[in-house]
Each structure stands twice: as structure tokens, then as C-alpha cells.
């Protein structure tokens, strides 16, 4: 739904849709003031959930004093159908023994009473005592070599950067993706960077460092042709089991969309050796409904897809099967590439103390790396899997 410049107050919440510049065509986002996340009432939680589904992403201002326990409590309340898991189970969503991606990332967990999944997504020194984490320095890993077209370190130091990887939160195996996701921005670096697409398009975008990029998958759906909408409405995707283990050796495309076709996936015979339960492999509609607004979103994370089940219309009984990483990614790139442009991308938030919640079933987001010379980044990330099953025009989700 398009944002306007009007201001509305729902109960105690002041909800102000974002007003984007004349160079922007994106149609989502809102700011919220008048909400204390440490003391939110049940009515305010309900209003916040509705605002997130309606505006896709909300930035709650002035949350410098928010407590990690209250952060985790809010994440659970925003999805009453959440799926509780332990920290050990969290790692096992990505690899049966907790190895692989999660072990490689070495995520620091912010202590909470319930051992919630509030992870420290920062850079540099996190302080002498950050909620019980003592003198933690997250260092500076340079991600330039992750791309199939590497980013030169001297360019990176000079302020050039890239989108890292467009994705929705969740493992895409065993459990359903989180309904709503959370980033609390505690400390942010200063300066300016230029995100370069580096894909031959010549596109670029000025940003502040340490922020996160977002685009709307409902806006993407609206950009499709009638023929394309008829196809995606009736099609589905099957994700690889433990998909992040499958693509762990892959390099990313320089614009952050998908991974490069270089044959670097873990071989299928090696994947077959990984213990798994076929019941946990996820097949979802390409298009997901927003239960509040009834909007449709083209909600596909292409780098993790094993095969596509394509029906051009509701009358087509048997799907056309598209499989093989190169064919799948080429097909999805043609559908998704059009939204990855500066005018459709929001990068935020603006300042420290902002807490961002977004509708994970209707957005894609990407980290943007920066040099530590700009200063430390202290951010709390949180999400919880959902028992909700994504629904769309094609009822295939499991």
C-alpha cells in the first residue's frame, strides 16, 4: 500500500507513513512514536502488528533504553503462533549438528532470561559490558571476496560497498520462516558510502554505513505483467534441504541477488550424506498472501531453490519442472531483477535508538558491509520461526 504524508494516531501509537524522495518509487514504510517497548500494552502490541503488516516495515523511534528481555518478549507477542526453539535447535536448523553457516558466523547471543534468540549483529568493539558480554570485539571481516566479481579492498576503504545477499529470515527447512523480524540499532557508524551494483547496469546508491537494505515483494508482484502474474499465482518452489549448507561455498552476484553460477554448490552426493527428514523439506507457493491487506507477494529466495514447479495458468494440471541451479536462477532473475534498483530500495534506519520491525513474509533485506574506520556497529537481531503456514493462490505449502 502506498505511503502518504499523513499522520494517524491509533490508541497510544503515532504512526506516520514514510515520505520518500522524488527519486524514489518504493511504497512502504512508517515511523512510530509514542511507544515504549519496555512497557507495551496488549492493545499496543496488536496495533504494532497491524502497522507492520500494513506498512511492511516500521521504525520505532526512541528505544535507547529497551531491554533485551523485552525485545524477545515483543518478538514472540507479534506472532502468537510462533515456534519456540532452543539455542541448540537454532543451529541445527542450518546443519544437523549445528556446524556450517551458524558455526562459521560465530553469532554472539545477547543474554536474556528465557535464552531468547537475540543475536549481536555488530562490528568492532561492543563495549566493556554489553548486557553481560564482556569486552567483546567482533573485529572486521572483509567480505569483498565473497562476490563473483570481487570488490577491491582499496575501493571498500574508500567508501564503495555492495548489497551482501537479498533474503528473508529463516532456514527454509524444518520450520516456517518468521512472520515478523526485528533489528534494534543501538550504535551506528558515521560517514557515507556508495552501494555499487557492479553488474553492468551502472546503478549506485548513496547510503549511511551500518544500515540494512529492504525491498517489498508485494511491490515486485505488482510490477509483473499479467502473464507473469498468472504464472506465479499458480506456481511453487521446492527449497533444497539444509539450503545454506548446499550454497555455503558459493559466491554472490555483485548486486546481492542470488548466488553466482560457478558450480560451487556442495555436490548432491555429498548433500545426500547429510542426515535429514524429507518431511521437513519446504515447498511453498511462489506467491504469499498478506492476511491483513490481502496483497500478494512474490516471496521466493532464489539462491536456496532446488526446483521450480511452474504452471502457466490454473487450468494446467501438471507443472513444468525447472531444476538445476543455473536454470532455476536464470528463471528467477528474470522475475526479480526489476525490483533491485535504487528507486525501489529503502536503506535504514536513520539514527541510534531506532528499532526496526518488518513483515518477513512480504520483504527481502540485505546487509551492507562497511569499513571499521567509520566506527562500531551494535545491533540486536531477533526472529522466531512461525507455526503459520504461508498461503497463496496455490495451496502447496508444507
From Swiss-Prot:
The domain of life is: Eukaryota
List, separated by semicolons, the cofactors it needs: Fe(2+)
The gene is bsc7
Disulfide partners? none
Q: Name one GO molecular function term.
A: dioxygenase activity
Protein name per its UniProtKB record:
Alpha-ketoglutarate-dependent dioxygenase bsc9
**Stated role:** Alpha-ketoglutarate dependent dioxygenase; part of the gene cluster that mediates the biosynthesis of the diterpene glucoside brassicicene C. In the first step of the brassicicene C biosynthesis, the bifunctional diterpene synthase bsc8 that possesses both prenyl transferase and terpene cyclase activity, converts isopentenyl diphosphate and dimethylallyl diphosphate into geranylgeranyl diphosphate (GGDP) that is further converted into fusicocca-2,10(14)-diene, the first precursor for brassicicene C.
**What is this enzyme's EC?**
1.14.11.-
Membership in a protein family: Belongs to the TfdA dioxygenase family.
Biological pathway? Mycotoxin biosynthesis
Where 2-oxoglutarate binds, per the record, is at 212, 377
Keyword Metal-binding included in the entry's annotation: yes
Q: What Pfam family is a match for this entry?
A: TauD
**Organism this protein belongs to:** Alternaria brassicicola (Dark leaf spot agent)
Keywords recorded for this protein, A-Z: Dioxygenase, Iron, Metal-binding, Oxidoreductase
- Co-factor binding details: Binds 1 Fe(2+) ion per subunit.
Gene3D superfamilies linked to this entry: Clavaminate synthase-like
Amino acid at each position: 500500500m502506498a505511503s502518504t504524508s499523513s499522520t494517524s494516531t491509533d490508541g497510544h501509537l503515532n504512526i506516520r507513513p514514510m515520505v520518500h524522495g522524488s527519486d524514489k518509487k518504493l511504497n512502504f514504510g512508517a515511523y512510530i512514536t509514542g511507544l515504549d517497548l519496555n512497557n507495551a500494552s496488549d492493545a499496543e502490541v496488536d496495533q504494532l502488528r497491524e502497522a507492520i503488516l500494513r506498512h511492511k516495515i516500521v521504525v520505532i523511534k526512541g528505544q535507547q533504553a529497551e531491554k533485551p528481555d523485552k525485545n524477545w518478549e515483543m518478538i514472540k507477542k507479534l506472532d502468537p503462533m510462533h515456534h519456540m526453539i532452543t539455542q541448540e535447535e537454532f543451529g541445527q536448523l542450518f546443519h544437523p549438528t549445528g556446524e556450517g553457516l551458524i558455526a562459521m558466523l560465530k553469532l554472539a547471543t545477547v543474554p536474556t532470561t528465557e535464552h531468547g534468540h537475540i543475536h549481536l549483529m555488530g562490528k568492532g568493539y561492543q563495549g566493556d559490558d554489553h548486557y553481560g558480554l564482556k569486552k567483546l570485539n567482533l573485529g572486521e571481516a572483509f567480505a569483498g571476496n565473497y562476490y563473483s566479481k570481487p570488490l577491491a579492498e582499496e575501493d571498500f576503504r574508500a567508501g564503495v560497498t555492495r548489497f551482501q545477499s537479498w533474503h528473508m529470515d529463516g532456514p527454509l527447512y524444518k520450520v516456517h520462516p518468521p512472520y515478523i523480524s526485528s533489528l534494534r540499532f543501538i550504535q551506528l557508524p558515521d560517514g557515507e558510502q556508495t552501494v555499487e551494483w557492479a553488474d553492468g547496469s551502472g546503478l549506485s546508491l548513496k547510503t549511511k554505513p551500518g544500515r540494512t537494505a529492504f525491498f517489498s515483494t508485494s511491490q515486485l508482484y505488482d510490477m509483473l505483467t499479467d502473464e507473469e502474474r498468472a504464472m506465479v499465482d499458480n506456481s511453487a518452489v521446492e527449497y533444497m534441504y539444509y539450503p545454506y549448507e548446499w550454497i555455503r561455498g558459493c559466491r554472490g552476484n555483485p548486486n546481492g541477488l542470488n548466488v553466482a553460477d560457478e558450480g560451487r554448490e556442495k555436490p548432491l552426493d555429498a548433500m545426500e550424506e547429510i542426515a535429514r527428514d524429507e518431511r521437513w523439506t519446504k515447498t511453498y507457493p511462489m506467491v504469499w498472501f498478506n492476511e491483513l491487506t490481502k496483497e500478494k507477494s512474490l516471496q521466493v529466495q532464489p539462491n536456496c531453490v532446488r526446483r521450480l514447479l511452474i504452471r502457466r495458468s490454473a487450468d494446467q494440471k501438471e507443472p513444468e519442472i525447472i531444476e538445476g541451479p543455473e536454470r532455476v536462477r536464470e528463471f528467477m532473475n528474470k522475475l526479480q531483477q526489476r525490483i533491485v534498483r535504487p528507486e525501489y530500495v529503502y536503506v535504514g534506519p536513520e539514527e541510534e535508538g531506532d528499532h526496526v520491525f518488518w513483515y518477513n513474509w512480504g520483504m527481502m533485506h540485505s546487509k551492507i558491509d562497511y569499513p571499521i574506520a567509520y566506527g562500531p556497529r551494535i545491533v540486536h537481531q531477533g526472529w522466531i520461526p512461525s507455526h503459520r503456514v504461508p498461503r497463496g493462490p496455490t495451496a502447496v505449502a508444507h
